[in-house]
Structure formats: C-alpha cells, structure tokens
C-alpha cells in the first residue's frame, strides 16, 4: 500500500499541484467545472434568450431594463448539478419595467415571452422560468422589479401558480450587488488561476499558453480565478453528493457563496481554504442551533434580503448539514496531518464528492505524478527524501488504485 506523500518544503514556486492533497482537490475541481466549450455556449445562450424575450410582439418588448447573470454564473462558481456529473444550472435576472400587476402577473409575462422557445422544455417555477437544453444545461430566468434608486436593488416574485396556501408576494433581492461584493473579496490569484485553467483547457483539447493573466486571449478566458471560488465549488459539489437522493430543499448555493466571501483569504492553499469554508458554515449553524434559532444569512450589500429564507426549515435540517461539513473538514485535516494511505483517501473522497468524478481525478493525479517522476520534477517526499513509488499502486499502467480491505477505522476522522 502507498502512503500519501508529504510535501518537500523548499523555495519552489507555489502552485496548486505542489502539495499532493491540493493536487487531488485541484483535479476534482477541474472535473466539476463547466467545460470551456459549454462556458462559451452558456454566454451565447444568455444573449439569445435576451434577444428572444425582447423580440417584436413579445409581452416584454421594450420592457426589459437590463439583463444580467446572477448566482454561480456571476461569480464563476458553476458546477454540475445535484446528482449529476454533466448537467449545469445557470441563472439570469431580467429587470422588468412597466405596470406592476403583482408577482404572479410578472411571472406570467415572462412565461408568455418564452413561449415556444426552442429548447427541450420550458418550466415555470415559483420564482423563475427554467429552460432545459438537450445537452443538460438549465437556464433559470428570474424577473425582477426595481424598488430603489440604488442600482438593481429591487424584488423578485414568489408565486406558486394556483396555490392559495402560499400567497404570492415579492421578495427583496440585489444579486448584482452581492456578486460585486463577492468578486471584490476574491481577486484573481494569478499563479493558481493560470495553472488550473491551463489544465482545464488541455483536458478539453484547447491550447492554453498564456504567459500571465493580462495575456489571456479572449477565446480562452480565465474560467477559474481564485482559491476561494474553487473551494466553494468543492463545497457545493460535496453538498450535491450529500443530498443527491433527497427530494426537499437543500442548503442554498448563495448562502455558501456568502460564507465563502466572508471566509476569503487570498494566498491560502486549496485544502486549507476548503476546510476553512466548511468550518465557517458549520460553526454558523452550530451557533444558531445553540441559541435555539435557525440560521440567518443576509445579503451583505442588501440586509433585508435573506439568503436563508427557504432553508433551513428546521433544526434537524441545519444540524444534519453541519455534521456533513464537520465530517468533511475532519477528514481533510486528517489527510493533511496524518500518515494517510492513498487508497483510504481515494475511498473517502468518493463518499464526499462522488464516485465517477473522484475516479477521473485520481487517474489524472496518477498520470501527472508519473510524468513528474519521469521528468525528475517530483516534489513529494517521505521523511525528507525524494518519494519515488516502488510499486504501480500510484503510477502503474492501470493508473487507478485498487481498493483495500475494510477496516474498523480509517485515518480520515471517521468510523467505518
């Protein structure tokens, strides 16, 4: 069996693949990204939808004041959706002008404007209209109304059609200001961004040879920009796997994004930031639970907007998620500080992030490690010496790690 190698501490340039745990997590992040081809397609679809709802004869002709991305699309934190490896949700806001006939009428107008749009299906939700594309992409378009002079500060409809038990109402919203706040707190970390984007584009078969951030050509934009956002994507992936079989509401992405923004500290390693974000949300939940309250997370730029207005609904809901996050952080800390078997790490990661994506990521890690050994660039050590695998368990021809016999305990901070 192969021990997870430790990092040789020296003056080598900091990069996301230098530490073995960071390297595996970086490969995981690459495998849950919106691929470059779909990223470009998402931008095209965004523009196409805008043109369609403003077309001559549309109920919204001349009424769309602005059209902008929100959520993960606005902060470059898109990942595959719950229970999938190749479906992606993207979010857009359409700010609507004109007579205010109520929240249900606002959704009615947007639904009518999107009638016959050429996608697999168009579905009306409680707060948005969702377009489902044949390739697995989902586009949520949320109508909003401006309620204050401040840019894009307003409200969105909450209207479940035909349901009297949940009256239609407007909900405060300023996702635009939140996105600006988040991006200001998570600046591009150049070395990290270039290393991961190069790997992402190469995996997609697209050349990426930028010398620095300023030289990145328009056709190869920096999809990955900061350690904070990559850790956020891994937190979201972890949540998606934890709730893959659940049918109810799950911890909202915008809540996790808000906590990530508060926890942001440029310059941290990926594993450290992932642990920091997991603990940040878990402890916020724990603090609320100790007071006998449900977690409340306001928009830092528009406090009347509550990112937790629909989740959690109970103490059980929030404490269950807190336990999931503590388990994740405990396991990562064990991997960073303990003598962890790589086979144990792989098995544990599958439980946290999903089988297929972990298998692909570990294979990529093995291949990268093999290339480094062959080119004498390997920087991992055990007890201070150069770590060179003696058996094919890490870099052998099969490149995947064989499972080991079950044990009563693992080194990952949990009982089997």
From Swiss-Prot:
Pfam families: SMODS. Residues 150-167 have a biased composition (Basic and acidic residues). It catalyses: UTP + GTP = 3',3'-cGMP-UMP + 2 diphosphate; GTP + ATP = 3',3'-cGAMP + 2 diphosphate; 2 ATP = 3',3'-c-di-AMP + 2 diphosphate. GO terms for molecular function: ATP binding; GTP binding; metal ion binding; nucleotidyltransferase activity. InterPro entries: NT_2-5OAS_ClassI-CCAase. The active site is at 89, 91, 140. Binds at least 1 Mg(2+) ion per subunit. Keywords: Antiviral defense, ATP-binding, GTP-binding, Magnesium, Metal-binding, Nucleotide metabolism, Nucleotide-binding, Nucleotidyltransferase, Transferase. Its cofactor is Mg(2+). The record marks 70 as: Important for nucleotide discrimination. Residues 145-167 are annotated as: Disordered. Mg(2+) binds at residue 91. Its EC number is 2.7.7.85. One of its GO terms (biological process) is nucleotide metabolic process. GTP binds at residues 72, 91, 236, 253, 305-306, 309. Cyclic nucleotide synthase (second messenger synthase) of a CBASS antivirus system. CBASS (cyclic oligonucleotide-based antiphage signaling system) provides immunity against bacteriophage. The CD-NTase protein synthesizes cyclic nucleotides in response to infection; these serve as specific second messenger signals. The signals activate a diverse range of effectors, leading to bacterial cell death and thus abortive phage infection. A type II-short CBASS system. Belongs to the CD-NTase family. G10 subfamily. This is Cyclic dinucleotide synthase CdnG. The gene is cdnG.
